[in-house]
A protein has these predicted regions:
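Terminal amphipathic helices with adjacent charged low-complexity linkers/tails
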Residues: 81-83
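Glycine-rich loop at the start of a catalytic domain that most often binds anionic cofactors/ligands
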Residues: 55-61, 85-94
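A sequence-level detector of short, solvent-exposed, charge-rich linear segments
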Residues: 42, 46, 56, 85, ...
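Active-site glycine-centered loops adjacent to acidic/histidine catalytic or metal-binding residues
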Residues: 78
Length: 185
């Protein structure tokens, strides 16, 4: 490969181990699984570490394949490493801890919003590249993002004001289903 970022692909029909009869047998073996997942909703959640490790493009290729097989996808991403890095860059003396609920000040909330927006745009851009040099090249994947989560403020607990900290109250499932009905991720 001339560019280390390019993903090398080989046509299954050209690979020696996939002679036409072998390919047909393999295809027949996977067909029931394809039928089983078509139309199902998969929620794919991953942490910000995946993006930090530059594995987003590989994930997008896999998700595009699932989408092409008729799987409806809901993608949920984390951002802890990126938020902590942004807080450090801005000189804010706070680090988010996974699984720990702490009061969220306005400046911390702003960092969280900036990072979440940046990651969302990175994900959308990865899907919008047309997946060059992959078996999914020229596929059109549509992304719909929105405020599908309704939050509930934590409020004051044991005399501690949790400021802008919230927890999930509910998900707007009707809006998610409408987006999925449009064959969007």
């Amino acid at each position: 490969m001339s560019n280390p970022q390019e993903i090398e692909t080989v046509s299954a029909l050209e690979a020696a181990e996939f002679a036409p009869t072998q390919f047909v047998r393999w295809f027949r073996e996977v067909a029931p699984y394809v039928r089983e997942v078509r139309g199902k909703i998969f929620v794919i959640a991953f942490g910000g570490e995946l993006i930090e490790e530059s594995k987003l493009n590989n994930l997008v290729i896999d998700l595009s394949l699932l989408s092409a097989l008729g799987v409806q996808l809901v993608v949920v991403y984390g951002s802890h490493p990126q938020v902590n890095q942004q807080l450090k860059l801005k000189g804010i003396d706070t680090q988010l801890q996974r699984g720990v609920i702490e009061p969220t000040a306005v400046d911390v909330l702003e960092c969280c919003k900036e990072v979440a927006g940046e990651i969302r745009l990175d994900i959308e851009a990865a899907f919008s590249q047309g997946l060059p040099n992959t078996p999914m090249s020229n596929s059109q994947i549509h992304i719909i993002s929105g405020n599908f989560v309704i939050a509930q403020p934590v409020g004051v607990v044991d005399g501690v004001d949790y400021k802008h900290t919230g927890k999930v109250r509910k998900f707007d499932l009707d809006s998610i289903r409408k987006a999925l009905a449009l064959n969007a991720i």
